[in-house]
Amino acid sequence: MSVMSYNGGAVMAMKGKNCVAIAADRRFGIQAQMVTTDFQKIFPMGDRLYIGLAGLATDVQTVAQRLKFRLNLYELKEGRQIKPYTLMSMVANLLYEKRFGPYYTEPVIAGLDPKTFKPFICSLDLIGCPMVTDDFVVSGTCSEQMYGMCESLWEPNMDPEHLFETISQAMLNAVDRDAVSGMGVIVHIIEKDKITTRTLKARMD
């Protein structure tokens, strides 16, 4: 059994027109045993910037805390909010430092540039190799199912409501076909002037 599927979990980000969305499931379990249904996998890293972490639950929390520490240092030193691309480099450095005994988590970053409000999404593997795309990124135990749903439903230049509907349908239908993710989904829609957070009900089995 892979360490990456020990706790299960799924995270996804999608790009729209002047907006991005990031979604994650809410399950924390140990293989088939369910522990809790409100586990946090998406963490704020700025006013319009979020990171989603799927993988081993202990490493999800460790990476989130260490990243927050580095982010606070960066903002104190630079006196400004971090750009999404810079955060990607910061995460890549953090993960690559531990490449011989890696953090078992594959991050997904979604946000808007603090000055230009240009949408940005990317994913990284567990040793910090980044992949920046213009459509969607996925991470977690049901990544094949998520890729299938996203390839079918995603279209360019979606408005925030359309983007929410698309990411929600993709996420809910993907986690329904995975035994170790699900138990509800949390979705953040990031726009220039507001962030909308919605919690979706899903199958609880």
Swiss-Prot record:
It comes from Rattus norvegicus. Keywords: Acetylation, Cytoplasm, Nucleus, Proteasome. The modification N-acetylserine is found at residue 2. This is Proteasome subunit beta type-3. Signal peptide: none annotated. PROSITE patterns: PROTEASOME_BETA_1 (PS00854), PROTEASOME_BETA_2 (PS51476). InterPro entries: Ntn_hydrolases_N, Proteasome_beta_3, Proteasome_bsu_CS, Proteasome_sua/b, Proteasome_suB-type. The modification N6-acetyllysine is found at residue 77. It is found in: Cytoplasm; Nucleus. GO terms for biological process: proteasome-mediated ubiquitin-dependent protein catabolic process. It comes from the Eukaryota. The 26S proteasome consists of a 20S proteasome core and two 19S regulatory subunits. The 20S proteasome core is a barrel-shaped complex made of 28 subunits that are arranged in four stacked rings. The two outer rings are each formed by seven alpha subunits, and the two inner rings are formed by seven beta subunits. The proteolytic activity is exerted by three beta-subunits PSMB5, PSMB6 and PSMB7. Pfam families: Proteasome. One of its GO terms (cellular component) is cytosol. SUPFAM superfamilies: N-terminal nucleophile aminohydrolases (Ntn hydrolases) (SSF56235). Belongs to the peptidase T1B family. Non-catalytic component of the 20S core proteasome complex involved in the proteolytic degradation of most intracellular proteins. This complex plays numerous essential roles within the cell by associating with different regulatory particles. Associated with two 19S regulatory particles, forms the 26S proteasome and thus participates in the ATP-dependent degradation of ubiquitinated proteins.
